[in-house]
Amino acid sequence: MSPDGELVPVDSSAVVTAKRKTSQLSRSWISIDATGQKTVLDVDKHVIMHRVQIHARDLRILDPNLFYPSAILGRERAIVLNLEHIKAIITAEEVLIRDSSDENVIPVLEEFQRRLPVGNEAHGVHGDGDLGEEDESPFEFRALEVALEAICSFLAARTTELEKFAYPALDELTLKISSRNLERVRKLKSAMTRLTARVQKVRDELEQLLDDDGDMADLYLTRKLVGASSSVSVSDEPIWYPTSPTIGSMISRASRVSLVTVRGDDETDVEELEMLLEAYFMQIDSTLNKLTELREYIDDTEDYINIQLDNHRNQLIQLELMLSAGTVCVSVYSMIAGIFGMNIPNTWNHDHGYIFKWVVSLTGTFCIVLFVIILSYARFRGLIGS
């Protein structure tokens, strides 16, 4: 309705645009808990921020429409994970993943559903008598391991695929230098440079975590949660009972395995996470080494091609030198012929016809000898010949 009280028709395109903006604000998330149960959450960012207690800047890192480098950030109650197409938030009881249309995310979701409930299944099969065989790793570590394995395998597969096309193309270029082969190698080199930057960023992020025990300690979400529950239980306040059975079982299991991990110096014990990160650091470092070897092979191929081009250039210079020497000799011959061909009165022109034969013969012989002398001097100086 207009300010004058008249009815104004509603623009259908504006309604569609408004609905589209609303759908973008309430982007879908996929939640996977410790039992492998997948739930689709169609909520806005404020609900997610309140759910996992992170800041807006942390959530902005996971926006697929914005470009942010790979990062693993430890927060009070969550781990913010941005590894290429894997954009997730890991808590002590669930994993929240962006509902992306990327086809590479679907296998990661299936892997989360398959591997996250492994500890519970093992406990159900073996019973309480075989606690030693139960997977006692915290939930966040199992989720982090799935994500790291997925991204390392993804980058390794891209590297293998690049090697599959790069090495034959480089070998073909060494055999035949053509515009088609050069353009093909140029595209492969550009792809290798981009892939190397992506692998390098993931490697640097893991290396940064390994170098800082404090950052690794921030990733122990279950330990911090157990410590908070223990401090509450020993106080005069009523005992806090976790409403979630999943988080309650994790607290009891973590307390049963190591009761003292939340007290004293054990709070800085990051050996378990360090071994986990080191394993995938070595894997991503191996992938980076393959790319480095490929870059060195490309550099060697470029050097070989430059040597071939220099050789052809030297051959052209030698040919130019020989043609220049021949041109000098022909010029001398033409000069002598021009002198005798001038229309100048000369006594030699009378009754001395045999002189023409001597002049032609001697001049031709002189030019040939001069040409041989020039080439011999050039060969002696190393200017031609090899």
Swiss-Prot record:
One of its GO terms (molecular function) is magnesium ion transmembrane transporter activity. Pfam families: MRS2-like. Signal peptide: none annotated. Disruption phenotype: Displays plantlets with retarded development under low Mg(2+) concentrations growth conditions. A motif (Required for magnesium transport activity) lies at residues 341-343. Isoform 1 is expressed in the whole plant. Isoform 4 is expressed only in roots and flowers. It is a multi-pass membrane protein. It is found in: Endoplasmic reticulum membrane. Keywords: Endoplasmic reticulum, Ion transport, Magnesium, Membrane, Transmembrane, Transmembrane helix, Transport. One of its GO terms (cellular component) is endoplasmic reticulum membrane. It comes from the Eukaryota. The chain crosses the membrane at residues 321-341, 355-375. Its main location: endoplasmic reticulum. PANTHER family: MAGNESIUM TRANSPORTER MRS2-7-RELATED, RNA SPLICING PROTEIN MRS2, MITOCHONDRIAL. Low-affinity magnesium transporter that mediates the influx of magnesium. Has the ability to complement mutants in Salmonella enterica and yeast lacking magnesium transport capability. Belongs to the CorA metal ion transporter (MIT) (TC 1.A.35.5) family. This is Magnesium transporter MRS2-7. The gene is MRS2-7.
